[in-house]
Every structure is written in structure tokens, then in C-alpha cells.
């Protein structure tokens, strides 16, 4: 094993020939300037400054597709406001919570409480007790607390909106402090699923982030590339090519940055001197495989079982039907001593897998045999899906 390490060090050394600082290509990086989001920065900062000046806070709901700069703009604005407030001896702080990663109400409220220095155990307290401690500590602190709930639609679908209702009403319980809630979502219909009492308060101010176009993506990538790569390693046309690919996918800056970063990493692995368009093409395939793998491994159990049965049936004869999938799924569930889901629910799961791009399904009319759904899987996706399902016993 040591020989492998020695060989890698001999070939590549400790200093990268490609990257100067690859971190600037990661989605968590917050640059000093955010091209093409000046209007959004100004509008959000104006809303938050009103609250910081002691006026009644207005909660903000931010919509936009993936990679449109929602999260980075919010982080940029709140961190700058915190920095400025600190220099003026004003009390302003924020909690950023990705509610997809912190997947329970307890973990969300604990993270919010911890952001103002409260010590909260990982388990053991009632949610209402953590909330009460947070409100008491916040009022003693006496400043403006900005709570950012990213991917808030996932949280509400999973946990309901009780905590959000408490947070949007929390200012009624506070005499010396204030709370502003910022929700970030990809779902334009998100508020329609909220309790009417929450809906009116959560979306007092709404902002929509439009997708970037290819020209804007080029500016963003050029700015980051100058910081990320050693001089002269990016071949002409690479940044334009990455921008064009990402612009085709609803102007996703995150996708564009991933493409550029992975292209550089592949070039580095292969010992190349420069990042070329060929490496971008390789990166496109690698990222797609990673997306498929993550989509499969994060599926709930029944979806995994259904997909595994589809894989087995498709491998045997290229395509299958809803009825065949349901029979195979029901048999394995009975063997495992579990009650199978209904045929209707399995049909819904198949539709979901189709929408995710993991399978291809088509409803066809077979005359006297009736209407059925033909299900296939792209051949190039089969190995990745099988690998992601390898630990599923079925």
C-alpha cells in the first residue's frame, strides 16, 4: 500500500499542477462579489436593514431553481450584515439551517438555539423545552436573529409546519429581541401547502431568483477560474463550453462550477498539464453517474425494492410491465414477512422513478389486453443503479 502512495507522490507531488485553490469551485464558497445578483443582494439587504433598525420584521420567502444563487446570496448578505453590526456594537446574528440535512424538528430547533451560544443536548429534551430556552435566551441577548431555513419545502413535507408557525409568531413573545425568518425553496407552490396562519406570515416578502443565461454563467466561471486554477492551465473554450452546458439545464451555476471542478480533477488524476474540453466531456459522464448513484441510495426502502425488481426483470428481457413488477415486488415482501403496498401505490412509485430519470416508462394500448405501462432502463445507467442497490436484500 505504501508503494501506491509513493508512486502517487512521485507522479503528482504535494502541490497541484492544475489547482491553485479548488475550494472556490465548491457550492459552500462565498466569493467577495456575486456577479448578476446585485439587485437581489440590494433588495434582501434593504428588507433586513429595516428589521435591524428596530422596525417590525418582515419574513422573506425566496424561490428559484437549483443553482440560481439563492443560498449564496442569503449567506453573503447575512454574513456582511453581521460583520457590519459587530463593528458598530449592534447585536445581529443568524442561524443557517439546511433542513434537508438536519431532518427532524428537534435537530432544526437545536441548531437554531446553538447559533446564539445555547448548549443543547443531541437528544433528551422535549422540542417545546428547547424552543422555550431559545426564546428566553434570545430575549436576554436582545438583538436581531435571522433564521435561514434552506430547502424548507422538504422540511414541511416531512415534519409539518408547527415549528414554522411558532417561529413566525415568536416576535409576540419577545420584548427585547426580534426574529426574521428567511425560507429558501425550489418549489413555487410551497406556500399552498402551508397552514393559512403560517402562509400569511411566512411569505410577507417574496423574491424570485431567475436562472442565469450562458453569458452570465461565463462571467461567474471566469471569476472563479482565476482564483481556482494555476495560470494558463484552462484551454480556450473550456469555460464557454461549461457555461453552455449548464445554461441548457435551466442556468444552473452549481452545475457549471461542478463541471469545471471535476474537469480539473480528472485532468489532475490523469497527469495532464491542461484542462481541455475532452476533460469536460468526461466530467459530464462522471457527474451524471454520481447523480444517479445518490438518487438511488437515498430512496426509501419500498422504492429501492421496486427499482431492484425492475432491474432484474429488465436485465432478463429488456423491458417489463407494472403488473410484472408488482408480482415480483409482492413475492419478495411476503418472503420478508412484510405486507406489500397496493398496486396503485406501486404504480405511483414507478411514476416517481420515471420522473427522477431512473427508468423510462411508456403507457401503451394493447388492444383487447388493455392499457399497460412498458418499463425500461437505459443500458448505460444499469451498472450504476445496480451498484447503488447492491446492499438491498431482495
Swiss-Prot record:
Keyword Flavoprotein: no
Gene Ontology MF: a single term: ATP binding
Gene3D superfamilies the UniProt entry points to: 1.10.8.60, P-loop containing nucleotide triphosphate hydrolases, Winged helix-like DNA-binding domain superfamily/Winged helix DNA-binding domain
Record-listed ATP binding positions: 68-72, 212, 224
Matching Pfam families: AAA_22, Cdc6_C, Cdc6_lid
One record GO biological process: DNA replication
Entry keyword set: ATP-binding, DNA replication, Nucleotide-binding
Keyword Nucleotide-binding (UniProt): yes
InterPro entries: AAA+_ATPase, AAA_22, Cdc6_C, Cdc6_lid, ORC1/CDC6, Orc1/Cdc6_arc, P-loop_NTPase, WH-like_DNA-bd_sf
NCBIfam families: orc1/cdc6 family replication initiation protein (TIGR02928)
Function recorded in the entry: Involved in regulation of DNA replication.
UniProt record similarity statement: Belongs to the CDC6/cdc18 family.
Name of the protein in question: ORC1-type DNA replication protein
Species: Desulfurococcus amylolyticus (strain DSM 18924 / JCM 16383 / VKM B-2413 / 1221n) (Desulfurococcus kamchatkensis)
Taxon lineage: Archaea, Thermoproteota, Thermoprotei, Desulfurococcales, Desulfurococcaceae
Gene label: cdc6
Amino acid at each position: 500500500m505504501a508503494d501506491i502512495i509513493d508512486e502517487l507522490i512521485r507522479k503528482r507531488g504535494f502541490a497541484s499542477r492544475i489547482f491553485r485553490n479548488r475550494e472556490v469551485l465548491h457550492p459552500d464558497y462565498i466569493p467577495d462579489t456575486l456577479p448578476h445578483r446585485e439587485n437581489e443582494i440590494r433588495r434582501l439587504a434593504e428588507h433586513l436593514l429595516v428589521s435591524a433598525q428596530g422596525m417590525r420584521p418582515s419574513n422573506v420567502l425566496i424561490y428559484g431553481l437549483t443553482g440560481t444563487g439563492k443560498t449564496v446570496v442569503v449567506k453573503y448578505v447575512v454574513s456582511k450584515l453581521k460583520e457590519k453590526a459587530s463593528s458598530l456594537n449592534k447585536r445581529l446574528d443568524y442561524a443557517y439551517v439546511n433542513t434537508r440535512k438536519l431532518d427532524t424538528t428537534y435537530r432544526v430547533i437545536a441548531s437554531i438555539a446553538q447559533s446564539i451560544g445555547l448548549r443543547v443536548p443531541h437528544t433528551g429534551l422535549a422540542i417545546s423545552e428547547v424552543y422555550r430556552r431559545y426564546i428566553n435566551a434570545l430575549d436576554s441577548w436582545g438583538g436581531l436573529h435571522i433564521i435561514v431555513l434552506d430547502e424548507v419545502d422538504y422540511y414541511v413535507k416531512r415534519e409539518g409546519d408547527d415549528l414554522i408557525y411558532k417561529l413566525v409568531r415568536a416576535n409576540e413573545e419577545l420584548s427585547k429581541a426580534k426574529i426574521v425568518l428567511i425560507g429558501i425553496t425550489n418549489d413555487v407552490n410551497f406556500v399552498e401547502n402551508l397552514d393559512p396562519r403560517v402562509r400569511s406570515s411566512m411569505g410577507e416578502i417574496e423574491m424570485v431568483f431567475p436562472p442565469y443565461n450562458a453569458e452570465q454563467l461565463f462571467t461567474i466561471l471566469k471569476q472563479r477560474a482565476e482564483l481556482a486554477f494555476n495560470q494558463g492551465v484552462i484551454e480556450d473554450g473550456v469555460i464557454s463550453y461549461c457555461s453552455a452546458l449548464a445554461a441548457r439545464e435551466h442556468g444552473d451555476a452549481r452545475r457549471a462550477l461542478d463541471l469545471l471542478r471535476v474537469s480539473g480533477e480528472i485532468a489532475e488524476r490523469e497527469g495532464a498539464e491542461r484542462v481541455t474540453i475532452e476533460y469536460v466531456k468526461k466530467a459530464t459522464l462522471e457527474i451524471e453517474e454520481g447523480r444517479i448513484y445518490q438518487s438511488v441510495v437515498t430512496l426509501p426502502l419500498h422504492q429501492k425494492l421496486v427499482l431492484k425488481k425492475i432491474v432484474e426483470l429488465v436485465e432478463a428481457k429488456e423491458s417489463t410491465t407494472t403488473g410484472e413488477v408488482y408480482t415480483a415486488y409482492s413475492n419478495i415482501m411476503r418472503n420478508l414477512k412484510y405486507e406489500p403496498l397496493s398496486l396503485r401505490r406501486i404504480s405511483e412509485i414507478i411514476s416517481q422513478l420515471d420522473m427522477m430519470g431512473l427508468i423510462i416508462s411508456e403507457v401503451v394500448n394493447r388492444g383487447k389486453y388493455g392499457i399497460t405501462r412498458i418499463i425500461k432502463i437505459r443500458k448505460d445507467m444499469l451498472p450504476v443503479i445496480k451498484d447503488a442497490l447492491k446492499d438491498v436484500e431482495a
